[in-house]
Amino acid sequence: MEPLYQAGSILMTVNTLQGKKMIESGLQSGDFSLSQSWPSCLPPPADLEILQQKVAGVQRELEDFKKEALKSIHYLEDAFCEMNGALVQQEEQAARVRQRLREEEDRGIVRNKVLTFLLPREKQLREHCKRLEDLLLDRGRDALRATKKSQAD
């Protein structure tokens, strides 16, 4: 029984070791042309022409696939570059936001220190104002009494 080898949609019958080696090397290299040393058991010319047309079709499909693959690779490279640029912008923006946050935290610390100083001082001043008001009211009452007393005399 002769072994069958399939390359894409092409079936070939190989009955010699030399033919088998030719087919295997053709499959590896992508070269499906027949050499002069091919045995004399070639298929009829009509079958050979059909096989050559199929090989040509497979080669066209391979070229089309290569073009599509390259187009897809270029598209992916462009998308990657675009995404990389957007990522760089986002990182720069994040760095600016972090810097603003640090500055705001620093201002918050300063505000807290100022408030820590001012609140007790405000309390002291309120107490002092209260004492002064009380003193003023006491003097005002004393002056009012003295005026009434002098008018009564």
Curated annotation (Swiss-Prot):
Coiled-coil boundaries: 46-109
GO-annotated biological processes: female gonad development
UniProt superkingdom: Eukaryota
InterPro entries: DUF4715 (IPR031678)
Keywords in alphabetical order: Coiled coil
Protein name: Coiled-coil domain-containing protein 182
Organism of this sequence: Homo sapiens
